[in-house]
């Protein structure tokens, strides 16, 4: 129920906010940020890694196996007296602030629609409950994507910060020249979308896991625990189809959104990030060919919502409210099913009610 309250309150609140200055914008949306932190920070036994992180946050100086920035920040918080459950709040606050700051820099205008899609379509919000390191890295990667449009130095620096929270983020350096790569790979967006969705259905889990493990150096396997992941993901491959279908069901909305490329209503920057959103969704689907490499899809969760966002914004501006309603309902119905079923990261379990 708390997830739904957050969704309704935050979307209504954000829909009233307009501010050009990023700092003042963050001040104005403080109630939304605080609610985000209360929910994510107050999780209790949500996700299979909850206990592992709780133990680490309680004794961070005993562990050195995590990435340097993550370990350093956790140790710093510990030395300040923020231990155990308290550190979940820190990472929730970091994620909330920088997601909104990066999105403001991107030029998001309709914050109610954007936040609705961020929660219901990207899956980022609830996945913070489990993949703490990778989700924090994903926030800095998203920010890097936005900065790369105007400053390669800022973008690359943010990629390096992301790598300090999760080593896998370094692969996103491949998008340093985001404009050229996006235009090249999205020249035929409809073909890209359909092909990536078909690719995700290819059954290649076990063999691909083995190939990846063989290619990675022993040091990387030890630091990232990918060898352990490979064994786990192969064992759970039988449940994969349901997860894939929950993503592939969004394909019609992406195909529908392509009409915006012909209307001339998008600015050059919006069109670039619209196309990058198409590419992000395509990669998000294509990486589902294997659950192990599917972990890299987290870096495209947030930008993948942009085509649907631009579509909804266009419908809103044209006062096509009925069409907008049906698009939002279709985009979010999987999310509401997960929330009401209370599965995995959508489990409603918080320390406040224990």
Segment roles from a protein language model:
Residues 90-106:
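Transmembrane-helix motifs of polytopic, lipid-linked glycan transferases
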């Amino acid at each position: 129920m708390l997830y739904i309250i957050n969704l309704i309150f935050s979307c209504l609140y954000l829909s009233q906010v307009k501010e050009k200055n990023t700092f003042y914008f963050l001040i104005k949306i403080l109630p939304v940020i605080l609610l985000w932190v209360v929910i994510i920070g107050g999780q209790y036994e949500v996700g299979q890694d909850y206990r592992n992180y709780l133990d680490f946050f309680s004794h961070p100086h005993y562990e050195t196996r995590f990435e340097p920035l993550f370990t350093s920040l956790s140790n710093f918080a510990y030395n300040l007296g923020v231990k155990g459950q308290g550190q979940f709040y820190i990472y929730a606050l970091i994620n909330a602030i920088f997601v909104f700051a990066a999105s403001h820099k991107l030029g998001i205008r309709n914050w109610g629609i954007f936040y609705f899609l961020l929660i219901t379509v990207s899956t980022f919000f609830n996945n913070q409950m489990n993949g703490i390191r990778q989700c924090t890295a994903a926030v800095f990667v998203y920010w890097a994507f936005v900065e790369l449009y105007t400053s390669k130095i800022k973008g690359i620096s943010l990629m390096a910060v992301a790598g300090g929270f999760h080593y896998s983020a370094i692969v996103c350096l491949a998008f340093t020249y985001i404009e050229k790569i996006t235009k090249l790979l999205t020249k035929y967006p409809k073909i890209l979308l359909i092909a990536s969705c078909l690719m995700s259905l290819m059954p290649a889990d076990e063999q691909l896991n083995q190939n990846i493990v063989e290619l990675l150096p022993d040091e990387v396997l030890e630091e990232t625990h990918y060898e352990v992941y490979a064994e786990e993901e192969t064992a759970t491959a039988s449940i994969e189809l349901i997860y894939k279908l929950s993503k592939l069901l969004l394909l019609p909305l992406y195909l529908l959104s392509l009409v915006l490329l012909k209307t001339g209503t998008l600015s050059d920057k919006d069109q670039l990030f619209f196309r990058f959103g198409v590419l992000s969704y395509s990669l998000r689907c294509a990486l589902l060919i294997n659950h192990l490499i599917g972990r890299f899809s987290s870096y495209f969760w947030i930008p993948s919502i942009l085509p649907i966002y631009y579509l909804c914004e266009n419908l809103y501006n044209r006062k096509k409210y009925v069409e907008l309603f049906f698009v939002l309902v279709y985009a979010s119905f999987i999310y509401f099913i997960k929330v009401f079923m209370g599965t995995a990261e959508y489990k409603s379990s918080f320390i406040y009610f224990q």
